[in-house]
Regions:
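Glycine-rich phosphate-binding loop signature in dinucleotide/nucleotide-binding domains
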Residues: 45-47, 126-134
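Active-site-proximal alpha-helix that buttresses catalytic centers in soluble enzyme cores
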Residues: 7, 11-72, 99
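Short beta-strand scaffold positions
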Residues: 53-54, 117, 138-139
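Domain-level recognition of soluble alpha/beta enzyme cores
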Residues: 152-172
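Short active-site segment of divalent metal-dependent hydrolases/proteases
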Residues: 12, 143-144
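Short aromatic-enriched loop/helix-cap "lid" or pocket-rim segments at secondary-structure transitions
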Residues: 16-19, 86-90, 150
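Generic beta-sheet signal
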Residues: 4, 133-141
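Phosphate-handling substructures
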Residues: 68-120, 124, 160
């Protein structure tokens, strides 16, 4: 069994400004840096075998901070990348009046089926690459929700959103 510490990246400048980040790099703000340091402190004595991050800067930075006390490298994978929000990327979220109605969304947004397929691929990859190990993975709000949706075999809307720098444990 692989034990997964699933973490969402620390707070970013765009989180605060309510900008749809999607697959943009993003930068941690002061609070986000502090959140990552708090997770590092909380887990510094946990025997974690590997650290994995999305290939987006906000997650890499969070993961590097958490991994530092363990003196371990961070492995990067695009499987943990946030949902591609297409034409919504970079937009002010409150201005997206049709956000609650997917039928009205632009056609270039990554589908739920596609993101869940990526989440399933990530879980399979972890089981293969890190059998019987403890792995900390830093991702994003929607991909982390998709991973949990696949893991628990529940619709994504039944998975509670993760706060910035929140940790959830999954036994794979």
């Amino acid at each position: 069994m692989t034990l997964l510490y699933l973490v969402r990246h620390g707070e970013t400048i765009d989180n605060v400004h309510r900008i749809m980040q999607g697959q943009t790099q993003g930068e941690l703000n002061e609070k986000g840096l502090k959140q990552a340091q708090e997770v590092a402190e909380q887990l510094k004595n946990e025997p974690i075998d590997a650290f994995v991050s999305s290939d987006l800067r906000r997650s890499i930075h969070t993961c590097e901070i958490i991994a530092a006390p363990h003196h371990q490298p961070v492995r990067i994978t695009p499987l943990l990348r946030e949902r591609d929000w297409g034409a919504f990327t970079g937009k002010y979220i409150p201005d997206l009046s049709n956000l609650k109605n997917p039928a009205l969304w632009p056609k270039d947004i990554e589908s739920i089926d596609a993101i869940k397929a990526r989440a399933a691929e990530f879980i399979a990859w972890l089981r293969t690459e890190y059998p019987n190990q403890k792995v900390l993975a830093v991702g994003h709000g929607i991909i982390n929700k998709a991973i949990q949706s696949v893991y628990y075999d529940k619709p994504m809307n039944e998975i509670l959103p993760m706060s910035n720098a929140e940790i959830r444990m999954l036994e794979l």
